[in-house]
């Protein structure tokens, strides 16, 4: 578990005092670095080795002073030696390292001076031993506080997707398939994130695979079975003589590890793939990428059939900002100088509830929750300027405010786990600000993700309409001519009394079902849809029904733009976003695009019609007769 930043700073001060007079490179350098890692509550033995042999350029061989594979390379010199030369020496080791071993940071020191090179950000930092306590935040990657930077097409996200897909394929080839395989991969995703984001001790899971399983992989399946059982067992109920490598794992709960799974069979190749997954830095992967991870292991035919279009965070924000986020920030600006009103606003945030009735692997719910927690932190910064004894008591927003329905079991499992992981990342963000480590373990609350067909179950069974605040998502993009037999039956049921309902695209079923659900409430809805619902024949069928029988009013709309994603074989489609409710509002917003790939230009209008332009709620219906004699 991660130490608080206050504790880390205190340890850094004590470290500096203890080592302020040391000068000899070899005599005490190893003790120096053991103590350095202890500043962050990390055992150096667990993550890094001294004098790591490596082949240099040509036929020469060398030894790295301290090496944490895939993360950190340290070169240590006697006090006063040339540190720039030491940096060159460190870089010269790179050709002898495997790709997965290449470090993200180089750290050079002579006891007195520290030089840290962040190779991914291309940034350098220099400070003295006495200034270390002021710069401990630079070593968040050691403590487990690494921040996630959202980068479209981030290579590490693509690498993670490829590796998980590769592991999926080799397991499936052995006959390990279906529910067991899917649930196993979801558990593995949690374990990978957990050890890189301070839910577990650093490298706890990786070390378990490296040191407690045979190189031929023959015992990995049984070791996983033991591990899953331990993760699902409270400390006071565990065996007294439990192996130390297992006893170190925390109690997770949340039912994630409760179900008994068949034991998978591994070999040496599969073990290597598993370890390659472990060597990635999962702290740099947003849980929102789980959609991409899921899509990357589906075949093309299956993906098209499900209409599984996963998308970028930037596009998701196009929906959630006008739906609720912009309004919440406007209210925050109005009340932030009045602590009483701000506290009431904070309490209100914890009562908001969100439903994605076609949630897939949770992308929309994840980003919505993340943005809610970021706003909560801004509130907490103002309300709690003094030290806080227990930050868990001031964090009121939680994952159980978020609800989803998903027809695919694997995707629903991923969504559930991803919500826990984004919650943990947000807790780390708050921990960093208040200098106090906070983790929600064992898991007591969870997002309410239901594995079911959204068009076949009453949404009231998921969450009562008098409790819900917002509905959001991107229901499947499947045209009316591409529906399978079951989907056609669903459409016939939903549009039973709607004339010509058979020509409507699949997504329109969510519009009608949402319109029925929100009657007599203040619930606001926003869906991403193919632009066919705002042009041509479908407008006269769908919107006539919604306007006439359910009193629907469009509150905001994004006109046609290109909706693409970052997943393998990404699916690009022309879409619109429509925000609506069963009540009217002023200052409606239209987001216009000069072309489908340009940025949006916003304008405020009095009314938005179903063609998503300013105008009255008039629809053009299909006619079989001419308007006048000719």
Language model features: what each stretch is:
Residues 1-105, 121-122, 144-147:
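A short, conserved, highly charged catalytic patch centered on acidic carboxylates
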Residues 2-16, 130-371, 401, 405-414, ...:
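Preference for the N-terminal adenyl/adenosyl cofactor-binding alpha/beta module
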Residues 6, 26-34, 186, 291, ...:
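Short amphipathic alpha-helical segments
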Residues 56-61, 209-225, 340-350, 390-395, ...:
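Short, mixed-charge aromatic SLiMs
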Residues 69, 101, 347, 352, ...:
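Structured loop/turn residues at beta-strand edges in well-structured enzyme cores
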């Amino acid at each position: 578990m991660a130490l608080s930043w206050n504790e880390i700073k205190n340890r850094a001060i004590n470290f500096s005092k203890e080592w302020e007079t040391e000068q000899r490179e070899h005599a005490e350098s190893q003790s120096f670095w053991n103590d350095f890692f202890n500043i962050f509550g990390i055992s150096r033995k667990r993550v890094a080795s001294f004098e790591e042999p490596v082949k240099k350029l040509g036929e020469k061989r060398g030894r790295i002073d301290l090496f944490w594979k895939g993360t950190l390379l340290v070169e240590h010199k006697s006090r006063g030696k040339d540190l720039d030369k030491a940096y060159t020496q460190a870089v010269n080791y790179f050709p002898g390292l495997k790709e997965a071993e290449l470090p993200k940071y180089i750290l050079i020191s002579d006891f007195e001076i520290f030089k840290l090179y962040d190779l991914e950000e291309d940034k350098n930092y220099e400070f003295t031993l006495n200034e270390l306590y002021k710069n401990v935040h630079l070593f968040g990657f050691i403590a487990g506080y690494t921040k996630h930077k959202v980068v479209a097409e981030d290579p590490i996200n693509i690498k993670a997707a490829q590796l998980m897909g590769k592991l999926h394929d080799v397991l499936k080839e052995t006959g390990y398939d279906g529910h067991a395989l899917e649930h196993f991969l979801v558990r593995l995703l949690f374990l990978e994130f957990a050890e890189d984001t301070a839910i577990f001790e650093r490298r706890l899971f990786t070390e378990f695979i490296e040191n407690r399983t045979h190189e031929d992989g023959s015992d990995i399946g049984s070791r996983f079975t033991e591990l899953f059982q331990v993760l699902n067992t409270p400390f006071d109920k565990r065996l007294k003589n439990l192996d130390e490598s297992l006893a170190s794992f925390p109690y997770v709960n949340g039912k994630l590890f409760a179900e008994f799974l068949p034991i998978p069979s591994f070999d040496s190749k599969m073990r290597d793939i598993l370890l390659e997954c472990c060597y990635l830095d999962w702290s740099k992967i947003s849980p929102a990428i789980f959609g991409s991870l899921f899509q990357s292991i589906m075949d093309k035919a299956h993906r098209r059939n499900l209409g599984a279009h996963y998308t970028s965070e930037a596009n998701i924000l196009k929906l959630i900002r006008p739906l609720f986020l912009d309004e919440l920030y406007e209210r925050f600006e109005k009340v932030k100088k009045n602590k009483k009103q701000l506290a009431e606003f904070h309490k209100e945030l914890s009562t908001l509830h969100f439903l994605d009735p076609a949630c897939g692997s949770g992308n929309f719910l994840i980003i919505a929750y993340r943005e809610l927690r970021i706003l909560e932190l801004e509130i907490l910064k103002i309300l709690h300027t003094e030290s806080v004894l227990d930050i868990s008591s001031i964090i009121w927003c939680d994952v159980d405010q978020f609800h989803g329905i998903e027809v695919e079991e694997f995707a629903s499992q991923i969504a559930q786990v991803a919500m826990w992981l984004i919650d943990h990342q947000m807790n780390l963000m708050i921990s960093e600000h208040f200098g106090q480590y906070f983790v929600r373990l064992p898991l007591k609350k969870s997002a309410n993700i239901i594995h079911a067909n959204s068009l076949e179950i009453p949404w009231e069974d998921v969450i009562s309409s008098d409790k819900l605040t917002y509905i959001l998502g991107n229901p499947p993009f499947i045209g009316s001519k591409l529906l399978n037999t079951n989907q056609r039956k669903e459409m016939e049921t939903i549009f039973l009394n709607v004339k010509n309902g058979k020509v409507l695209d699949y997504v329109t079923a969510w519009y009608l079902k949402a319109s029925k659900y929100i009657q007599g409430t203040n619930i606001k809805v926003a869906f991403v849809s193919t632009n066919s619902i705002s042009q041509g024949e479908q407008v006269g069928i769908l919107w006539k029904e919604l306007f006439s029988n359910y009193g629907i009013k469009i509150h905001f709309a994004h006109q046609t733009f290109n909706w693409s994603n970052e997943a393998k074989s990404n699916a690009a489609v022309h879409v619109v976003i429509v925000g609506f409710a069963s009540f009217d509002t002023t200052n409606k917003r239209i987001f216009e695009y000069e072309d489908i790939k340009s940025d949006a230009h916003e304008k405020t209008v009095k009314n938005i019609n179903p063609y998503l332009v300013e105008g009255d709620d008039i629809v053009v219906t299909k006619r079989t007769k001419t308007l006048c004699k000719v």
